[in-house]
Amino acid sequence: MLDVPSITKSIVNHVQTSLSRQAYNLDDLGAYEAAALSAKDNMLVRLADLDRNERTAHFAQLNWNETQLAYTRKQPKRAYYLCIEYLMGRTFDNALLNLGLKDKYREGIEKLGFNLEDLLVKERDAALGNGGLGRLAACYLDSSSSQELPVWGYSLRYKYGIFQQLIAPDGSQLEAPDPWLEHLNPFEIPRYDIQYDVRFYGQAERTTGGRAVWSGGQEVLALAYDVMIPGNIQPNRSRFGV
């Protein structure tokens, strides 16, 4: 059973191994990163103690890897949602709620001398969208995962976000980059085996036979990242690829 001592042990392990830090120099940001990595472990392969109706506790496996394996074996019809914007919200709090582990993580984090609410605010919102379109796209993924539907969401991973709005001293509105990846994103899973050449600019040239060949321009290498979307107390995991 995943208990509070197991959670604190997992967090401490990430502090020492993933972050290469020790208790004497650990601040709220470091504690958040370690706790978030611990929560990601639970979304990947571990077990969570759940209480669906606050009456009957049951023990269910919430396993990202098993979700993908089950889809591969059963070959169901899949849906792929491509959207230029996603307003995902903060992943850490959402993950703890949907795993049914928020109270245990709160207690475990307090035993380490930190406060869960202080850590939650350290997560930067994924600057991948705003407004109704972005939130609707995020709701599609949350709902699909909760209903155990094989849905994948795809978008662009904006390094500096779409933009952030600032107010100048004279009261005018300013637009500036949003460096939301300044401290990286502990919930991302880089897929170094999935890379694509993306070409900007250039021109299309006709060859013999009428074929068009793109030439010139600037070429960049795009790397894929996955982010797990936990369903509301469900074993299913949708995937968000950027």
Predicted regions and their residues:
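A conserved ligand/cofactor-binding region detector
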Residues: 1-242
